[in-house]
A protein has these predicted regions:
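Short aromatic-centered micro-motifs
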Residues: 3, 49-51, 328
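Short beta-alpha connecting loops at secondary-structure transitions
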Residues: 3-4, 67-74, 181-185, 223, ...
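N-terminal cofactor/phosphate-binding cores enriched in small/glycine residues
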Residues: 7-67, 76-81
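Short, structural beta-strand-to-alpha-helix junction motif
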Residues: 16-20, 335, 499
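Fe-S ferredoxin-like electron-transfer domains
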Residues: 45-229, 233-237, 242
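Catalytic alpha/large subunits of respiratory electron-transfer oxidoreductases
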Residues: 90, 94, 147, 154, ...
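N-terminal leader/propeptide and maturation segments of large enzyme subunits in energy/redox metabolism
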Residues: 95-134, 493-555
Length: 598
């Protein structure tokens, strides 16, 4: 259908509202209660427009677009009514923008400057929730904080919990001037999706403990579009990088937020992917390769350089049956590139079909029965990809990986040398206590672990090779839908840690199996050639990885549904094409090149 907005003819799908039509066309109408991922409420009243042949002003968010409709967004009566609504919204709003976590990315700030009155006429005491009865700044559950004085009662949080989460834990209580959002007996919000409440809140009423007083948007100089690898959904995300003083090296991860993808995660993500990222820069990160002194489990792990680590790896594998006797236990956190290289190594070593096992963690994640955003129980991003590449991904009736036969061969002493690749967070590979016990008992003579963290497994290892996490490398994964997605590099691996494809290239070189690759893009090109008949992988060699975008441009271009709001803030910037992609082959990454070890 066709309608006219401010003299422009717009063609939109039937069923869309006037506000949706205006947003798609880049016509500026303010809104607070409307969110593209939630139902219509029409409570904030700031989206008032004038529609020809209608006697009163209408809310654009709740008025369906009609054939031949003529809409005006800037007539004097619209401007006056809109400014009056803003004045009412700001009457009791505290002037604490300098200490509010929403500052710098707050629609209330932006719209007030653009559409609100220039000054307040309020001469009476403001309504303040403070101390007696109802408190203003309170804990709002394990992950959130609530400041009731900032709330404008848009009901986005109420609708999110009811419509998306499936458990209506938040409601508006009291009435009139005393209206407030609250939970039953002030218990706060307990949900796997609670962090999304900060995203939907258009003011600083709901904030997260994780980001509280931590940073400002302008302190995060770059943002990288990537994906979350903490479960098999593969939510599309943005990693915000915080600048450090000059004496600190590079940027650091400030927060993870969801990125809109209607086919994967819509506008949302779970709290696991949002908040459980601190291990990436935590104290347990492996910074150097480690080799245990002596040939027994009783020796101490000593730091060594990469050349010594790989030389000793080759020596100890040779002393325990040679490379043909080596077996692999691989986490389903391994990327397509890493699995492909492991397959190449296994082929070069002559490993039998039962010489490799893939493992992952499965855990219950309680959610309401009617939730619209189900968090999968599998804590791994690439189970589907591992199966596509020919690795064993059989499961038991409970969905656990079926590694029983492989486990028996290790526990019985048939396996003398085991290589464990675990690039995910602690515990994500599943139960490996049997590996630790086999090494301690001496039934397993050699344990080599490659990963980013010091865990109980790495403490039991004879050789530890430090790798990178998913935010420290360009890598491809296939989620449970069979969708190929790219995780882009946001950080550089710390210390001597290397991207895992580099480690495999040099491990192969040390063991006499040449893998002639100079970048992860080079590996992807080979995977695409070998799996060209599989529809999923046809675009693998052209898969694009986002490079860090300047923060202003990211704010301007990140959320297609609300992109124009940032144009109001950054009118002096040139237009940004939201491609944010480059050909990864144009950014060569050099592997550590070692001389062949005799």
């Amino acid at each position: 259908m066709t309608l006219t907005v401010d003299g422009r003819q717009l063609t939109v799908e039937k069923g869309k509202t006037v506000l949706q039509a205006a947003i798609e066309a880049g016509i500026k109408i303010p809104y607070y209660c409307y969110h593209p991922g939630l139902g219509i409420d029409g409570s904030c009243r700031v989206c008032l427009v004038k529609i020809e042949k209608m006697p009163k002003l209408q809310t654009a968010c709740s008025t369906p677009a009609g054939e031949g409709m003529v809409v005006m967004t800037g007539t004097p009566d619209v401007v006056e009514a809109r400014a009056s609504v803003f004045e009412f919204l700001l009457i009791n709003h505290p002037l604490d923008c300098p200490v509010c976590d929403k500052g710098g990315e707050c629609p209330l700030q932006d719209f007030s400057y653009s559409f609100g009155p220039n000054e307040s006429r309020m001469e009476f005491p403001r309504r303040v929730f403070d101390g007696e009865g109802v408190k203003a700044d309170v804990d709002f559950g394990p992950t959130l904080m609530l400041n009731r004085n900032r709330c404008i009662l848009c009901t986005r949080c109420v609708r999110f919990m009811s419509e998306v989460d499936g458990d209506a834990q938040i409601n508006i209580t009291d009435r009139g001037n005393g209206s407030q959002i609250a939970t039953f007996q002030e218990e706060g919000v307990h949900s796997l999706l609670s962090g999304n409440l900060m995203d939907v809140c258009p003011v600083g009423a709901i904030t997260t403990r994780d980001y509280r007083f931590k940073s400002r948007p302008w302190d995060n100089p770059d943002a990288v579009d990537s994906i979350c690898t903490f479960c098999e959904r593969g939510c599309n995300t943005t990693a915000w990088l915080k600048a450090k003083p000059e004496w600190a090296r590079g940027a650091r991860l400030a927060r993870i937020t969801p990125r809109y993808n209607p086919d994967v995660n819509d506008y949302w993500m779970c709290d696991i992917g949002r908040f459980d990222y601190h291990w990436i820069e935590g104290d347990d990160r492996l910074l150097r390769a480690l080799v245990r002194s002596g040939d027994t489990a009783g020796g101490e792990l000593q730091p060594v350089d990469w050349h010594d680590a790989l030389a000793k790896t080759a020596d100890r594998i040779e002393a325990n049956g040679g490379r043909g006797a080596l077996r692999f236990l691989i986490s389903a956190h391994a990327s397509i590139e890493e699995l492909f290289l492991l397959g190449r190594l296994g082929g070069a070593f002559g490993l039998p079909e039962d010489g490799v096992a893939v493992s992952w963690r499965v855990r219950e994640k309680p959610q309401p029965a009617h939730t619209k955003f189900k968090v999968p129980p599998v804590d791994a991003p690439n189970v589907r990809g591992a199966g596509d590449l020919g690795f064993p991904t059989r499961t038991t009736s409970s969905g656990e990986p079926d590694t029983a036969a492989f486990r028996r061969s290790v526990e019985s002493g048939q396996v003398k040398a085991l290589f464990v690749f675990d690039p995910g967070p602690a515990g994500s590979i599943g139960d490996v206590s049997w590996v630790i016990e086999a090494r301690k008992s001496g039934k397993l003579a050699l344990l080599i672990v490659q990963g980013p963290l010091m865990t109980d497994l790495t403490r039991a290892a004879d050789i530890v090779l430090p790798g990178a996490c998913s935010y420290e490398k360009d890598a491809a994964y296939v989620n449970y839908q069979g969708r190929l997605q790219a995780a882009a590099k946001a950080l550089t691996a710390p210390g001597d840690a290397q991207e895992d494809w580099q480690v495999f290239v040099n491990l192969g070189l040390a063991l006499g199996a040449t893998l002639d690759y100079t970048s992860s893009a080079h590996v992807r090109a080979d995977v695409a050639r070998e799996l060209g008949g599989n529809e999923t992988y046809k675009g693998l060699s052209d898969l694009a990885f986002a490079r860090p975008l300047p923060a202003k441009h990211w704010l301007q271009a990140s959320n297609p549904s609300e992109r124009w709001k940032w144009d109001v803030m950054f009118q002096d910037l040139p237009p940004v094409k939201f491609e944010g992609r480059v050909d990864p082959s144009s950014i060569p990454v050099q592997a550590i090149r070692l001389q062949k070890i005799d």
